[in-house]
Amino acid sequence: MTILQRADQRLPTSMRPITFETKFYPYAEGSCMVSFGGTQVLCVATIEDNVPPHLRGKGKGWVTGEYSMLPRSSPDRIKRERDKIGGRTHEIQRLIGRVLRSVVNMDGWGERTIIVDC
């Protein structure tokens, strides 16, 4: 069995270094640049004073996520999704929202929505 050499010389069992830089973006209610070795993910949170129609009048909040790759986040430029998002992007957004809702208590902050852009 051949073991491939990683570009950064890590062993196959070694994790990439992980760092979090908070307050990365000055205009949002919250932001963080997360780095996993050479992979960087910018997450920005926005709070809006509304909820989806199915939650109106129930006093509960909502958390959702939006996702998009930057055009030069890969060796070849990725075209921006304009009018309609693709299936992969849609599924990643659904996954982000579901994961966030599974770990956030939405009962204590009224009818507000937190939108996390990644």
Place the predicted regions along the sequence by residue.
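Short, Gly/Pro- and small/polar-rich lid/capping loops
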Residues: 1-26
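A residue-level signal for beta-strand positions that form part of recognition/binding surfaces
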Residues: 17, 62, 113
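Generic structural motif
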Residues: 18-22, 78, 116
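Glycine-rich, flexible beta-strand/loop modules in the N-terminal catalytic cores of phosphate-handling
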Residues: 24, 32-109
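Hydrophobic, well-structured mid-protein blocks that either form specific transmembrane helices
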Residues: 107-118
